C-alpha cells in the first residue's frame, strides 16, 4: 500500500506590466472533473462537486483561500498549463496515470508562485477510519507486480 506525489512549484515572472492575476490554468483534455474541497486539511467528501475545467481558471490569491484546488483526473493522461496572454511564458505539466492533481499557492500570505502537484495518493477524507489499508486513494501493489506512472514538465520562455 502506498501513495506518492510530486510538489513542483513555479515562480511567476511578475513586473510592473504583469501581475499574478494575469496568469491562468488550462487543462487538457477539456472535460468536467470532480473537484474535492478541503476542510481542516481533510477531503470534504460530502461537498465534492462536478467542476468545469474546460475554460480558463484565473489565478488570484483568493482562489486558494480554502487551500488547494483538488481535481480527480481518473488516471488519464492530462496536461495542466500555466500561462498568461501578456507574454509567451508558459509551463505544461503532463501527468501519466495520475488520479489526482492539486493546484496550490500560499494563503493568506501571498507569493508569486503556484504549485501543480500530480498525486497518486491523497489526503485523508473527513470520514477516515485512520487505517492505512482503508485509506481512500491509496495504491495497492500485488507481489511481483509493478507500478508505472509519471509526470513531466516543459518550460516555454517569455520572449
Predicted segments with their positions:
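Solvent-exposed residues in well-ordered beta-strands and their adjoining turns
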Residues: 11, 28, 152-158
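Short, hydrophobic/aromatic beta-strand segments
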Residues: 1-5
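Glycine-rich active-site loops that engage anionic ligands at enzyme catalytic sites
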Residues: 83-127
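Beta-strand secondary-structure signal
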Residues: 24, 79-81, 115, 148-152
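Short alpha-helix capping/helix-loop boundary micro-motifs
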Residues: 131-138
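A residue-level signal for conserved active-site and pocket-lining positions in enzyme catalytic cores
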Residues: 7, 116, 144
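Short Pro-Gly-centered flexible turn/kink motifs
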Residues: 139-157
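Active-site/ligand-binding surface loops and adjacent short beta/alpha elements
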Residues: 9-96
Amino acid at each position: 500500500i502506498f501513495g506518492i506525489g510530486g510538489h513542483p512549484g513555479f515562480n511567476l515572472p511578475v513586473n510592473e506590466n504583469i501581475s499574478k492575476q494575469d496568469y491562468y490554468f488550462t487543462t487538457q483534455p477539456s472535460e468536467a472533473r470532480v473537484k474535492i474541497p478541503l476542510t481542516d486539511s481533510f477531503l470534504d467528501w460530502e461537498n465534492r462537486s462536478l467542476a468545469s475545467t474546460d475554460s480558463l481558471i484565473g489565478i488570484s490569491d483568493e482562489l486558494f483561500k480554502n487551500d488547494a484546488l483538488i481535481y480527480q483526473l481518473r488516471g488519464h493522461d492530462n496536461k495542466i498549463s500555466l500561462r498568461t496572454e501578456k507574454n509567451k511564458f508558459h509551463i505544461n505539466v503532463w501527468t501519466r496515470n495520475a488520479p489526482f492533481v492539486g493546484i496550490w499557492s500560499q494563503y493568506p500570505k501571498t507569493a508569486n508562485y503556484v504549485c501543480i502537484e500530480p498525486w497518486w495518493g491523497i489526503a485523508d477524507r473527513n470520514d477516515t477510519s485512520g487505517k492505512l489499508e482503508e485509506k481512500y486513494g491509496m495504491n495497492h501493489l500485488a507481489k511481483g507486480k509493478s507500478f508505472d506512472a509519471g509526470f513531466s514538465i516543459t518550460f516555454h520562455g517569455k520572449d
